[in-house]
Amino acid sequence: PIAGSMVLAAILLKLGGYGIIRIMQTLPTTKTDLFIPFITLALWGATLANLTCLQQTDLKSLIAYSSISHMGLVVAAITIQTPWGLSGAMALMIAHGFTSSALFCLANTTYERTHTRVLILTRGLHNILPMATTWWLLTNLMNIATPPTLNFTSELLIMSSLFNWCPTTIILLGLSMLITASYSLHMFLSTQAGPTLLNNQTEPTHSREHLLMALHLIPLMLISMKPELII
């Protein structure tokens, strides 16, 4: 069920990050060198999850692996125990909660009309669902972390804190963000561009679907304008 995927991506996945924040508060901040293996694993895991996204042909699997890669950045940022890292991790959890839930919602909108989640079979949706294409574009731009969204602010805070802690981390961080941009654009172009393969009649998008997307993206945009509410 799509509701389960949306709640899982938006709330349950972030509870792990919240748990790590609570545990880290009980540990001494001077011992961050002890956590180097965990930070390395988190960044390497984020990069591997992003590489897995590039191999996916299933739309829902791609979005799920995308959530895993973002949580790798969150874990790395929390583990170094700096104010910037903690603020960036909290902001990214909130921003990606909205974004990944919106992506799952859009994937279901596509699935209800095409009855498939294979990327190559869902192409050309721009021709039959033009309004949904706008939502796809906005959500993918937020997933890539383009300014001035909260995703950009949070990833910038995480990159700054990790780079200040150890400049070498910029290699895995930069690679991870480059791959994120690649698979997000690939997902958008695979589903929207090209000729449509659908021969049957397709119903247009409903008002409830537009309302659902607006309830995801408008709060995220409003928080992006005033990030000090959560940072």
Swiss-Prot record:
Keyword Nucleotide-binding (UniProt): no
* InterPro entries (UniProt xref): NADH_UbQ_OxRdtase, ND/Mrp_TM
Transmembrane feature ranges: 1-21, 34-54, 61-80, 84-106, 118-138, 156-178
Keyword set includes Lyase: no
| Single GO cellular component term | mitochondrial membrane
EC category: translocase
One GO-annotated biological process of the protein = electron transport coupled proton transport
EC id: 7.1.1.2
Sorted alphabetically, the keyword list is:
Electron transport, Membrane, Mitochondrion, NAD, Respiratory chain, Translocase, Transmembrane, Transmembrane helix, Transport, Ubiquinone
Q: Which cell locations does it reside in?
A: Mitochondrion membrane
User: Topology relative to the membrane, per the entry?
Assistant: Multi-pass membrane protein
List the GO molecular function terms.
NADH dehydrogenase (ubiquinone) activity; ubiquinone binding
Reactions catalysed according to its record: a ubiquinone + NADH + 5 H(+)(in) = a ubiquinol + NAD(+) + 4 H(+)(out)
Q: What does this protein do?
A: Core subunit of the mitochondrial membrane respiratory chain NADH dehydrogenase (Complex I) that is believed to belong to the minimal assembly required for catalysis. Complex I functions in the transfer of electrons from NADH to the respiratory chain. The immediate electron acceptor for the enzyme is believed to be ubiquinone.
User: What family does the Swiss-Prot or TrEMBL record give for this protein?
Assistant: Belongs to the complex I subunit 4 family.
Which protein, by its recorded name, is this? Answer: NADH-ubiquinone oxidoreductase chain 4
* Organism expressing this protein natively: Azemiops feae
